[in-house]
């Protein structure tokens, strides 16, 4: 549906917005992107753009950081980083935006990225008369009981 009123112009220069959009596109749609493995889709109409984030919860020793790189489950649940992802879609003609924070999710791209992808795709497909296809089994979440 169209907005009941036009979106307010925030005064950003178009060339600056293009730089940000290009960077967010690379995060999700190029193999150099930090969320590429978790948000890549073949259908252009369902592609999104986004930005990953991680919020450190606790100060970690060098040993803890090295262990966490090898296996996040080796770190106590309450000391694991929070995972963040913000995105918009569809890529070519954005209509929807979404942000997800997963407490102690470790990685924004790996944990929160697929959730944002599914939510945005559900909005895109659902509002075009189609049936959303949620792929929950791809979420790579590590919970309190270390069940991946």
Report residues per predicted region:
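Short, highly charged C-terminal tails/helix-capping segments
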Residues: 131-148
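Active-site beta-strand/loop architecture of penicillin-binding DD-peptidases
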Residues: 1-9, 15, 24-130
């Amino acid at each position: 549906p169209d907005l009941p009123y036009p979106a307010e112009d925030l005064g950003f220069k178009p060339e600056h917005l293009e730089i940000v959009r290009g960077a967010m596109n690379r995060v999700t749609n190029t193999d150099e992107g930090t969320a590429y493995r978790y948000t890549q889709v073949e259908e252009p109409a369902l592609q999104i753009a986004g930005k990953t984030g991680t919020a450190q919860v606790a100060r970690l020793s060098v040993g803890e950081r090295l262990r966490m790189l090898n296996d996040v489950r080796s770190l106590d649940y309450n000391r694991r980083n929070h995972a963040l992802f913000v995105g918009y879609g569809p890529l070519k003609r954005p209509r929807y935006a979404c942000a997800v924070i997963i407490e102690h999710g470790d990685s924004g791209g790996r944990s929160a990225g697929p959730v944002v992808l599914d939510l945005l795709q559900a909005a895109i497909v659902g509002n075009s008369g189609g049936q959303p296809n949620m792929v929950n089994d791809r979420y790579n979440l590590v919970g309190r009981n270390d069940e991946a």
